[in-house]
Design a protein with these regions (language model features):
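P-loop NTPase motor domains
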Residues: 1-245
Length: 245
């Protein structure tokens, strides 16, 4: 009784949390007919969803830190005691790996699937501190070219951890990223169609469909909102003088 009458006024862009997707069905065609771009992220049925890639909104080192903060805030670790230490350690590793992916990987590989491949390749041998896995070698090569590279600096801090501790950090990261390791989620985050950073530029309706009985993938909706608010606030301040058109 409240949402649909507001949507039907068609006076601005909208972001709608839409349990079960009924609002998108009832209002989507009207909005399309009136010149709106309509975007749908469907966490109930990924096959009926636009793609969402959080990596698509990274343009600077600051954006990398924001994405890592968003990831940590909206996902679950493995519940280790001393969570603050493990979160900080995870943050270092995510920052290093995402920095490497953003600056060194081809655009089509800048996504969570690649991040998971990196984590999976990070073998640690507790009895051999000199062992170097493929990720170590990749960062070693990058450091030889650009010793002050942002990702290299973060990775060196992570590598201060002893073998057993590093292994635990990797396990914590793997636990947090476990949902991204299912095929459907890898696919839906492979590239981006939501264009969150353009929401304030022209009339757009973004429907975020989520289950009201199963919270498994609600963290994706939370990540979208976190990135959306950051992106639009920055654009309002930097481009439009404090207010979106």
């Amino acid at each position: 009784f409240f949402i649909k009458p507001n949507l039907m006024q068609l006076h601005s862009s909208y972001v709608v949390t839409d349990p079960k997707g009924s609002i998108a069905v009832e209002c989507g065609k009207l909005m399309l007919r009136n010149g709106y771009k309509v975007k749908i992220f469907n966490s109930i049925n990924f096959k009926k969803s636009h793609h969402y890639n959080p990596f698509a909104y990274i343009h600077s080192e600051k954006d990398i830190l924001k994405l890592v903060t968003t990831l940590i805030a909206n996902t679950k670790g493995d519940g280790k005691s001393g969570d603050d230490f493990w979160q900080k350690a995870e943050t270092l590793l995510y920052t290093a790996l995402i920095g490497y992916i953003h600056y060194e990987a081809p655009e089509e590989e800048q996504n969570f699937a690649t991040l998971i491949e990196f984590i999976n390749a990070m073998e640690v041998r507790e009895d051999d501190e000199t062992f170097e896995n493929n990720v170590d070698l990749a960062f070693k090569e990058l450091a030889s070219r650009e010793p002050n590279h942002f990702a290299v600096r973060q990775y060196k801090k992570y590598k201060l951890a002893a073998g057993k501790t590093a292994k635990s950090i990797n396990i914590s990261c793997g636990a947090r990223l476990a949902p991204f390791d299912i095929q459907e989620l890898r696919e839906i985050t492979m590239y981006d169609e939501l264009e969150l950073d353009t929401l304030g530029d022209r009339k757009t309706a973004l429907f975020l469909i989520m289950s009201d009985t199963d919270s498994t993938f609600n963290f994706l909706i939370s990540m979208i909102y976190s990135q959306l608010f950051n992106l639009l606030c920055e654009k309002a301040d930097d481009v439009y003088g404090g207010r979106l058109p």
